Amino acid sequence: MNPWINADVLMVKKWTKNLFSLILNAPIEPFFAGQFNKLALYNSNPLNKNKIQRAYSYVNAPSEKNLEIYIVRVLNGQLSNLLYNLHSGDKIFIKKKSFGFFIIDEIPDCEILWMFATGTGIGPYCSILQEGKNINRFNHIILTHAVRYQNELTYLPLMKELRQKYNGKLQIQTITSREKHKNSLNGRIPFLLRNKILEKHVGFSINPQTSHVMLCGNPFMVKDTFLFLKNNRNMEKHLRRKKGHITMENYW
């Protein structure tokens, strides 16, 4: 059984006209960093009231008191627009138990752990790195966040704090695809890998001998990057029953 329970909305942080974070308090069961949950609200149709539900990942570490969920407001998206218009004191539904295996304990030992995210896919990595459990077995972690515009790097201040916390183990790299910015690489992740721009910039190469790659976010990025690594770097999908080099989570 995994019932719906009430979550209290403590705050709605609106970063841009389409990006926002919900700060919630709810008596959910303990979860693992990197997992996701489901949020729901009733639709506004009085003649046919149904719960609209979607899956969203946590940004916060499991040890934190409140939950933080990073969300993109989708054009004509039923739930995301309802969530965007919530206020402190409102209530929403959340599942008692969390879901998913995009967690650090599922990642095999390796020298270099690559964390690739697009958009709100940065959330699970923030949760994992804030929690910090089972991280010492990696010599280097490369956290890469790709967005369209520089102002969409909502959690860059947190990423910089985490870089300081890990004292040389963690490198962060930002990417913008629709504008050029002096502090970010320009392009899309598959393009920057195909041309070895990203690897040259961070000073490490992706290969099956030293690396494990985590992919989270836009399913087109996930698919294209996976196929590039499979076809050009001899890397395979990681499964519980068969050890590989790539762990993936699609965001829609």
Curated annotation (Swiss-Prot):
Keywords (A to Z) from UniProt: Cytoplasm, FAD, Flavoprotein, NADP, Nucleotide-binding, Oxidoreductase
Xref: SUPFAM superfamilies: Ferredoxin reductase-like, C-terminal NADP-linked domain, Riboflavin synthase domain-like
Protein name as catalogued: Flavodoxin/ferredoxin--NADP reductase
GO BP: any one term: heme catabolic process
Domain spans labelled FAD-binding FR-type: 2-105
Alphabetical list of InterPro entries matching this protein: FAD-bd_FR_type, FNR_bac, FNR_nucleotide-bd, FNR_type-1, OxRdtase_FAD/NAD-bd, Riboflavin_synthase-like_b-brl
Reactions mediated catalytically: 2 reduced [2Fe-2S]-[ferredoxin] + NADP(+) + H(+) = 2 oxidized [2Fe-2S]-[ferredoxin] + NADPH; reduced [flavodoxin] + NADP(+) = oxidized [flavodoxin] + NADPH + 2 H(+)
Family: Belongs to the ferredoxin--NADP reductase type 1 family.
This protein's GO CC annotations: cytoplasm
Free-text function comment from the UniProt entry: Transports electrons between flavodoxin or ferredoxin and NADPH.
Protein EC: 1.18.1.2, 1.19.1.1
Residues the entry annotates as binding FAD: R54, A55, Y56, S57, Y70, Q78, L79, S80, T120, Y251, W252
GO molecular function: ferredoxin-NADP+ reductase activity; nucleotide binding
Source domain of life: Bacteria
Subcellular location: Cytoplasm
Statement: the UniProt record of this protein carries the keyword Chloroplast: no
Pfam families given in the database record: NAD_binding_1 (PF00175)
Positions bound to NADP(+): V147, R148, S177, R178, R188, N218, P219, F220, D224
Cofactor(s) required, per the database record: FAD
